[in-house]
């Protein structure tokens, strides 16, 4: 790429232009999803600004409340949740919201209701705020059949029903990765323009990667297939080079690297967390949707992740996602154990 020429490019594909182009492909589209996504983008810009100024503005530190997951809430968590709830409700396109920070689902006032449900984690990896490690927002969007009579059952859909999913990573740059079911694209926030610009068009994950990403501190509690897979990563029997371990501890950052470079991200079940640790609706499903759209796979240890039907809004699940061949290898190990 000619960076000098790139610096003077004037024909920039903004995220708004991209979403409008996608909308124009569907003759039946009325623009509701476009409006909803524009409100999510605004929320991401707001949170990106707050994250950048957190230390200076004294937003770092505990807020003195505990969320539904039993984690002490940090000021930025609380702020980010408020920002996204207000942005989503004010769009007039949502009827129910599920946030990682709120114990109950939020049902939108009938006068402001639209046809979408949004499940989101407003600030994933927030324990990393104090040390400047990348953190992010994750979201998944579903269509609701009857917005006038929406119930909790409407929220508990399998991930394959999602119409769009994405995440925004607040790191060395602010990157928003989005799929509306037609591939995956990455946009980077240009602070001078205040716009997300298309920088990673049509992301495709490599078929096989050289990296595995897992918290090896939990190794003593793993099941046999997970332990075998990690052992093969470190000590391959076929004479090939071992895989490199990369683990940040922020799901958005770890999945982002996996998506771009290939490999596999795993957060398996173990004796301490027999149902896994990551939440289905706003962590497992959106990331699995993106991974499949980019040509990868996602697996729970029992089934394709997007086929899972949750029974409660904060349900957890084990997850293995990444390059197609790497996840295929993990599926083979679980199939062998089941025989």
Swiss-Prot record:
Gene deletion effect: Reduced tiller numbers, pale-green leaves, reduced growth rate and dwarf phenotype.
Subcellular location, record wording: Cytoplasm
Sequence positions that bind substrate: 124-127, 215-218, 246-251, 267, 277-279
List of residues binding Mg(2+) 1: 71, 100
Cofactor: binding details: Binds 3 Mg(2+) ions per subunit.
Cysteine pairs bridged by disulfides in the record: none
PANTHER family assigned to the protein according to its UniProt record, in alphabetical order: FRUCTOSE-1,6-BISPHOSPHATASE, CYTOSOLIC (PTHR11556:SF41), FRUCTOSE-1,6-BISPHOSPHATASE-RELATED (PTHR11556)
Subunit organization: Homotetramer.
Protein name from the UniProt record: Fructose-1,6-bisphosphatase, cytosolic
Encoding gene per record: CFBP1
């Amino acid at each position: 790429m000619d960076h000098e020429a790139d610096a003077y490019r004037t024909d920039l594909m903004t995220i708004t232009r991209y979403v409008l182009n996608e909308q124009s492909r569907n003759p039946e589209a009325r623009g509701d999803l476009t409006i909803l996504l524009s409100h999510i983008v605004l929320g991401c810009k707001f949170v990106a600004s707050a994250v950048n100024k957190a230390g200076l503005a004294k937003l770092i530190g505990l807020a003195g409340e505990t969320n539904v997951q039993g984690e002490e809430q940090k000021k930025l968590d609380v702020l980010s949740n408020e920002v996204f709830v207000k942005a989503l409700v004010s769009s007039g396109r949502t009827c129910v919201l599920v946030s990682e920070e709120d114990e109950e689902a939020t049902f939108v006032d009938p006068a402001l209701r639209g046809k979408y449900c949004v499940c989101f984690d407003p600030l994933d990896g927030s324990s990393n705020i104090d040390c400047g490690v990348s953190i992010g927002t994750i979201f998944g969007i579903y269509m609701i059949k009857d917005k006038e009579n929406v119930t909790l059952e409407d929220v508990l859909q399998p991930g394959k029903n999602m119409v769009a999913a994405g995440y925004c990573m607040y790191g060395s740059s602010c990157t928003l990765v989005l799929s509306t079911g037609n591939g995956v694209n990455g946009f980077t926030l240009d602070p001078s323009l205040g716009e997300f610009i298309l920088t990673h068009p049509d992301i495709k994950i490599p078929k096989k990667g050289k990296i595995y990403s897992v918290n090896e501190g939990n190794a003593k509690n793993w099941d046999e297939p997970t332990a075998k897979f990690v052992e093969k990563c470190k000590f391959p029997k076929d004479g090939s080079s071992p895989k490199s371990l990369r683990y940040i501890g922020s799901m958005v950052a770890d999945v982002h690297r996996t998506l771009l470079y290939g490999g596999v991200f795993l957060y398996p079940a173990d004796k301490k967390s027999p149902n896994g640790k990551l939440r289905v609706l706003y962590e497992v499903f959106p990331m699995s949707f993106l991974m499949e759209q980019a040509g990868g796979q996602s697996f729970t240890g029992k089934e394709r992740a997007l086929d899972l039907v949750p029974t409660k809004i904060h349900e957890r699940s084990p997850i293995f996602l990444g390059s197609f061949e790497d996840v295929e290898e993990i599926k083979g190990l679980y199939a062998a154990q089941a025989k």
